Swiss-Prot record:
The lineage of its organism: Bacteria, Pseudomonadati, Pseudomonadota, Alphaproteobacteria, Hyphomicrobiales. Is phosphorylated by ChpT-P on Asp-52. It comes from Brucella abortus (strain 2308). PANTHER family: STRESS RESPONSE REGULATOR PROTEIN 1, TWO-COMPONENT RESPONSE REGULATOR. Component of a regulatory phosphorelay system that controls B.abortus cell growth, division, and intracellular survival inside mammalian host cells. This signaling pathway is composed of CckA, ChpT, CtrA and CpdR. CpdR is a response regulator substrate of ChpT. Unphosphorylated CpdR controls steady-state levels of CtrA in the B.abortus cell, likely via CtrA destabilization and activation of its proteolysis. Residues 3-117 form the Response regulatory domain. One of its GO terms (cellular component) is cytoplasm. Disruption phenotype: Deletion of cpdR does not result in a gross defect in cell morphology and has no effect on intracellular B.abortus replication and/or survival in human macrophages. This is Response regulator receiver protein CpdR.
Length: 120
């Protein structure tokens, strides 16, 4: 079973994503901030980091940057209302990260995750 680490500070969105991703067959470990997610990344491997960009304690771009230092093969997907930030070539976001802009259809999220993990 593929393991997803989810970092999303919006409680309702996080609960919704966890439920949907588990229903799609993924094991999901979730946190409401980047710092806690980063701590878990240091303890165990994941197939995908699914993260919001704007979060307290550590933003999603910094989390993704640090995560790929630990595991260069980790797939990264940003879910955000601030797509321009992630796509900015001057940002520290990993170059092969995917960005899904809020609002999005759950079907689109699951399809993008499946594509990323198949390519792994």
């Amino acid at each position: 079973m593929k393991r997803i680490l989810l970092a999303e500070d919006d409680n309702d969105m996080r609960r919704f994503l966890v439920k949907a991703l588990e229903k799609a067959g993924y094991h999901v470990t979730h946190f409401d901030n980047g710092a806690s997610a980063y701590e878990r990344l240091q303890e165990e491997p994941f197939s995908l980091l699914l993260t919001d960009i704007v979060m307290p304690e550590m933003d999603g771009i910094e989390l993704a940057r640090r995560a790929t230092e630990i595991d260069p093969d980790l797939k990264i997907m940003f879910i955000t209302g601030f797509a321009a930030v992630a796509l900015n070539p001057d940002s520290d976001a990993p170059r092969d990260a995917k960005v899904l802009s809020k609002p999005f259809h759950l079907r689109d999220l699951v399809n993008e995750i499946e594509k990323m993990l198949i390519a792994a």
